From Swiss-Prot:
This is Large ribosomal subunit protein uL14c. The keyword Iron-sulfur does not apply. SMART domains: Ribosomal_L14. Binds to 23S rRNA. It is found in: Plastid, Chloroplast. Its main location: plastid. GO terms for cellular component: chloroplast; cytosolic large ribosomal subunit. Part of the 50S ribosomal subunit. Coiled coil: none annotated.
């Protein structure tokens, strides 16, 4: 469950290292975001000499949450941290690699480019 002011790790090689959620895209009064939701975030930590700088506002899609994800067949997926992948306005990832296994639900939400870059799909 990601809400505004939540810190997230970045799961790709775009150059950002840590994000802070400032808004959840999709509804005017949504309180929480889950896996597959798009958020507006600000960069809190970045790698030097990359296109991103601190305090830059970006969009990201959530790929890992500490809150468990329950599927209809009874499987529960739970990660150790909260993480997101930086995307552009069209929904394509800015990085060229993704460092974690991601949930199958992202394929159903039309993030096929992120799914194809991931090393494993759970």
């Amino acid at each position: 469950m990601i809400q505004p002011q939540t810190y997230l790790n970045v799961a790709d090689n775009s150059g950002a290292r840590e994000l802070m959620c400032i808004r959840i895209i999709g509804a005017s009064n949504r309180r929480y975001a889950y896996i597959g939701d798009i958020i507006v975030a600000v960069i809190k930590k970045a790698v030097p000499n990359t296109p991103f700088e601190r305090s830059e506002v970006i969009r990201a899609v959530i790929v890992r949450t500490c809150k468990e994800l329950k599927r209809s067949n009874g499987i529960i997926i739970k990660y150790d941290d909260n993480a997101a992948v930086v995307i552009d306005k069209e929904g394509n990832p800015k990085g060229t690699r993704i460092f974690c296994a991601i949930a199958r639900e992202l394929r159903q939400l039309n993030f096929t480019k992120i799914v194809s870059l991931a090393p494993e799909v759970l």
